[in-house]
């Protein structure tokens, strides 16, 4: 097959600028082949190279005594004691999920699971953070149904519990939904597998499913805005098979026990290209690939297609040659392909041969290490206009407005489509607060949460970035966990626009300050830019996934609210209504500044919760919807009413940060009051849990009536 001529239009269609193509000419010293152009396009796109964000990502705190492996590998690795480690990462699959919701979301789950077990860890938990357009938008229902089905379909069949996540709706996501997938696994701390190749002449082995044409150019597609040609991009979306992935995981983990693995890398974005280049680059070696040896499922595939295919459930390994037969036997047992497709070489070359013809011959280190790195112009987000007058709303009417909104109604409709109990180690299922999974065979547990409030980031990127981390810290603390580390998923619009780049820079500054103050280093992550359609960007959405350790299951703070329990608020209440949920849902206003985050107070309050958990029967952080929504959710979950003394909108629905709602009996409340006073912290009695009504001041409604609204509104909105 004759390859197309390299023209300006072809270069542009590969997402390369004229300046970038000139750089390629200088590197190669000649006109690149079509396959070489595709390889550069894959390695230099935003999705793989982080060329617009790398400068700022370097400023994130990524180290700590608990960190075994930080950013740069497939996933982060954190020590949890007793010779064990938790391996985790969050990653986006936004563009594919908008084009093909089911497969886009499903393969997002599959990709993040591979990142975890490639490191030698068995996945034990998954989460997802989903953002959609307004519920009335003609595409939203299709996207929600497809994405949720894809997440559940893949995760359920693979056999990993989904223990948490978020679902939000805003018109800013009408043209670009966000699908951020998180996975965590367990491994022996001294048996982590890395991707750096080692040794000259070592076999490079292809593992897993066969290669097809699905996903060709997927990484490049994910590095551009959408326009009216979106439907033409459907073939760039990968197709997943969770049962093959399950077999691949079992085979990979079994293979790792044989000692045959020198290095291993999953094939994700840019497929065979990116995995081979990364392995060679990290090991300071070259790589030769013979593509006629690659297992394929379609006829007459070209070198270009094989190098850029993003077919799922595939891995690349550098093998100890003396253990080839033992390794092959493992993959034969699991009915998966095992093919030696190349070797490591001493020369700094990335050599691609197909049917005896050299299709690409490039300097590997240069290909990996000289992707453009841009210092994009940016402007700081201007200070938000002051919040105008907010008239008081009847408290129960305000609550009803929140719990009937798809943003704050129960997400049972979503979570019941996920298997939350598979593996039988789930301690707390999704619905309220952080998810908890027992470390199998031990008395320890891990807690997981995913958090961000995009409207805060839009108004004030620095405070919004801080708040995303702080809320994750609070969610972990509220269940009794000690926060360990975080993973970030940075979802933004077009970085070539200074105002968008300013949002990114501000959020990074806020996140950096928060993870440093709260001792939650960033150990892995992902950047998704160009989330725009026809020039309209999403809300800036820097999602934070966080993991905490519960040393003993007895230390878990439960949800044991009972009639007669006292309601306490830890932290100061000032009635901050700027950018609040009540302002948006009742008044349709997005005004004022985001609430400020006092990181010293956040740390002190989290430490106080953990130190005094023996006195606490139930605990939740106060975030969206303030005290009113938190108290209702806690009461509704327990099936008992709640009476709060306050009746004014600011006290009930304000979103001051750093606060927790605590339920306990009277004696425990007294002990907590004394402890808080001694620590110099503010702890206030705000009411009690009792009866079967929700009463805020003089306004009340039956709990059962409000519970029906809360439980049924989400599904009804999608009907």
Curated annotation (Swiss-Prot):
Q: List positions binding Mg(2+) 2.
A: 115, 266
Binding positions (Mg(2+) 1): 91, 526
E.C. number(s) listed in UniProt: 6.3.5.3
Q: What's a Pfam family this protein contains?
A: AIRS_C
Question: Which residues participate in ATP binding?
Answer: 50, 89, 488, 525
Look up the record and name the pathway of this protein: Purine metabolism; IMP biosynthesis via de novo pathway; 5-amino-1-(5-phospho-D-ribosyl)imidazole from N(2)-formyl-N(1)-(5-phospho-D-ribosyl)glycinamide: step 1/2
Q: Name one GO biological process term.
A: 'de novo' IMP biosynthetic process
Key word Chloroplast present? no
Q: Which InterPro entries match?
A: PRibForGlyAmidine_synth_PurL, PurL_linker, PurM-like_C_dom, PurM-like_C_sf, PurM-like_N, PurM-like_N_sf
Q: Which domain of life is it from?
A: Bacteria
The task this protein performs is described as: Part of the phosphoribosylformylglycinamidine synthase complex involved in the purines biosynthetic pathway. Catalyzes the ATP-dependent conversion of formylglycinamide ribonucleotide (FGAR) and glutamine to yield formylglycinamidine ribonucleotide (FGAM) and glutamate. The FGAM synthase complex is composed of three subunits. PurQ produces an ammonia molecule by converting glutamine to glutamate. PurL transfers the ammonia molecule to FGAR to form FGAM in an ATP-dependent manner.
Name the family.
Answer: Belongs to the FGAMS family.
| Name recorded for this polypeptide | Phosphoribosylformylglycinamidine synthase subunit PurL
Q: Which gene encodes it?
A: purL
């Amino acid at each position: 097959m004759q390859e197309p001529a390299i023209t300006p239009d072809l270069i542009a269609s590969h997402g390369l600028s004229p300046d970038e193509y000139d750089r390629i000419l200088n590197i190669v010293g000649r006109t690149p082949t079509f396959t070489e152009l595709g390889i550069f396009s894959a390695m230099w796109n935003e999705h793989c190279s982080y060329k617009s964000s790398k400068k700022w990502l370097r400023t994130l705190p990524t180290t700590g005594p608990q960190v075994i492996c930080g950013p740069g590998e497939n996933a982060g690795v954190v020590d949890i004691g007793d010779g064990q480690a938790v391996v985790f990462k969050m990653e986006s699959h936004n563009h594919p999920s908008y084009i093909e919701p089911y497969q886009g979301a499903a393969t997002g789950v599959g990709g993040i699971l591979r990142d975890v077990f490639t490191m030698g860890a068995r996945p034990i938990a998954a989460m997802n953070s989903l953002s959609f357009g307004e519920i009335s938008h003609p595409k939203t229902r299709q996207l929600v149904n497809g994405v949720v089905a894809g997440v559940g379909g893949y995760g359920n069949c693979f056999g990993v519990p989904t223990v948490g996540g978020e679902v939000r709706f805003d018109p800013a996501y009408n043209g670009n939904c966000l699908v951020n997938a998180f996975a965590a696994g367990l491994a022996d701390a001294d048996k982590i597998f890395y991707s750096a190749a080692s040794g000259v002449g070592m076999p490079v082995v292809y593992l897993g499913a066969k290669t097809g044409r699905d996903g060709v150019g997927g990484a490049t597609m994910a590095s551009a805005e959408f326009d009216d040609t979106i439907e033409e991009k459907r073939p760039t979306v990968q197709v997943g098979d969770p049962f093959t992935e399950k077999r691949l995981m079992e085979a990979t983990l079994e293979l790792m026990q044989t000692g045959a693995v020198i290095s291993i890398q999953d094939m994700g974005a840019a497929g065979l290209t990116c995995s081979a280049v990364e392995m060679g680059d990290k090991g300071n070696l070259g790589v030769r690939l013979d593509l006629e040896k690659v297992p394929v499922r379609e006829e007459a595939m070209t070198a270009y297609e094989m190098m850029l295919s993003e077919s799922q459930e595939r891995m690349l390994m550098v093998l100890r040659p003396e253990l080839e037969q033992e390794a092959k036997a493992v993959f034969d047992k699991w009915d998966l392909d095992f093919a030696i497709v190349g070797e490591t070489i001493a020369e700094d070359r990335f050599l691609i041969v197909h049917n005896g013809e050299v299709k690409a011959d490039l300097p590997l280190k240069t290909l990996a290490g000289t992707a453009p790195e841009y210092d994009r112009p940016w402007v700081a987000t201007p200070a938000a206009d002051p919040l105008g007058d907010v008239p008081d709303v009847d408290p129960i009417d305000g609550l009803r407005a929140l719990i009937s909104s798809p943003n704050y109604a129960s997400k049972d409709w979503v979570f019941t489509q996920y298997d939350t109990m598979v593996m039988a180690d789930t301690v707390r299922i999704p619905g309220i607060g952080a998810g908890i999974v027992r470390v199998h065979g031990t008395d320890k547990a891990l807690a997981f949460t995913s958090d961000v409030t995009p409207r805060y980031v839009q108004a004030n990127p620095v405070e919004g970035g801080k708040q995303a981390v702080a809320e994750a810290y609070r969610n972990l603390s509220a269940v009794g966990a000690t926060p360990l580390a975080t993973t970030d998923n940075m979802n933004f619009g077009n970085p070539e626009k200074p105002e968008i780049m300013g949002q990114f820079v501000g959020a990074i500054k806020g996140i950096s300050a928060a993870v440093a103050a709260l001792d939650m280093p960033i150990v892995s992550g992902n950047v998704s830019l160009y989330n725009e359609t026809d020039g309209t960007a999403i809300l800036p959405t820097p999602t934070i996934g966080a993991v905490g350790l519960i040393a003993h299951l007895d230390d878990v703070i439960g949800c044991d609210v009972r009639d007669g329990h006292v309601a306490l608020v830890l932290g100061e209440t000032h009635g901050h209504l700027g950018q609040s949920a009540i302002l948006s849902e009742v008044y349709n206003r997005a005004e004022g500044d985001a609430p400020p985050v006092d990181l010293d107070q956040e740390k002190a309050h989290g430490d106080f919760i953990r130190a005094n958990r023996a006195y606490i029967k139930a605990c939740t952080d106060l975030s969206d919807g303030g005290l009113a929504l938190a108290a209702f959710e806690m009461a509704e979950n327990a099936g008992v009413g709640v009476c709060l003394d306050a009746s004014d909108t600011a006290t009930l629905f304000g979103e001051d940060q750093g606060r927790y709602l605590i339920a306990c009996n009277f004696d425990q409340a007294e002990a907590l009051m004394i402890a808080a006073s001694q620590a110099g912290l503010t702890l206030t009695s705000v009411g009690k849990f009792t009866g079967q009504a929700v009463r805020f001041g003089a306004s009340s409604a039956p709990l059962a009536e409000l519970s029906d609204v809360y439980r049924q509104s989400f599904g009804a909105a999608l009907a």
